[in-house]
């Protein structure tokens, strides 16, 4: 009987222990269930976050693609601006060379103008000399005429001096003839000089017209250079603006890349937490 009682007591103790173990097991199951529910809730939240992260990643990739397209467009704009600047530089070089040639032609025209002016001055001097000579010849002719009259008076007054007067008269007539010839030659020379002066004047007018045209072309070249300089400045401004835009886009791309790396790290961390939770559940 004692053995039965002891056995019953032992069984009761074992029953109590079993009940305690059962309660403990139920509590542990409840805790595990709650933890599992929390894990499932966290898993659902994580899945939502992953979905949102995927959407954000897609959006980031779309933004990156758009930024890349904009960057390519800006690079194309900068290349076009640089090409335009190079073209303008070549054109400006050609204009400078043409301006140098125009200045050289203007210099030659100026030298010719100075030479023509010198020739006109020389012609004027020669003309004045010939006029003075003509006046001298006329004065000599007047003197000869006076001498002739005096000789005629002397001839009328004194026949005995007729031969001497006749000889003097012949000499005077010869001098008069030579004077008339010189006067005629002087007049012809004056006509020639006047014609030469007219030709020189026409050449001078032609040179003045050429100089005026050269000045007009020079003004046109200067205006073209100012226009090219203005366009060059605008192109430089456009290039600087494009460069600043490229820098801003590059910063935006760098920021998106950093965000992408950060999201990948978050995804990796969440995956590691899920793996750890599943391992803990498997251990129970």
From Swiss-Prot:
Residues 1-284 form a coiled coil. PROSITE patterns: TROPOMYOSIN. Pfam families: Tropomyosin. Residues 40-78 are annotated as: Disordered. Its main location: cytoplasm. Disruption phenotype: Worms have 50-75% embryonic lethality. Those that survive body wall interference have abnormal body morphology and uncoordinated movements, and those that survive pharynx interference have deformed pharynges and gut regions. RNAi-mediated knockdown results in a wavy appearance of the actin filaments in adult body wall muscles. Isoform a and isoform d are expressed in body wall muscles, vulva, anus muscles and male tail muscles. Located to the myofibrils of thin actin filaments. It is found in: Cytoplasm; Cytoplasm, Myofibril, Sarcomere, I band. The keyword Coiled coil applies. GO terms for molecular function: actin filament binding. Keywords: Actin-binding, Coiled coil, Cytoplasm, Muscle protein. GO terms for cellular component: actin filament; cytoplasm; I band; striated muscle thin filament. GO terms for biological process: actin filament organization; locomotion; muscle contraction; negative regulation of actin filament depolymerization; regulation of actin filament polymerization; regulation of muscle contraction; spicule insertion. It comes from the Eukaryota. The keyword Cytoplasm applies. Belongs to the tropomyosin family. The molecule is in a coiled coil structure that is formed by 2 polypeptide chains. The sequence exhibits a prominent seven-residues periodicity. Tropomyosin, in association with the troponin complex, plays a central role in the calcium dependent regulation of muscle contraction. Involved in muscle actin filament organization and muscle arm extension and morphology. Protects actin filaments from depolymerization by unc-60 in vitro. Also has a role in male mating behavior by regulating the copulatory spicules. Binds to F-actin. This is Tropomyosin isoforms a/b/d/f. It comes from Caenorhabditis elegans. The gene is lev-11.
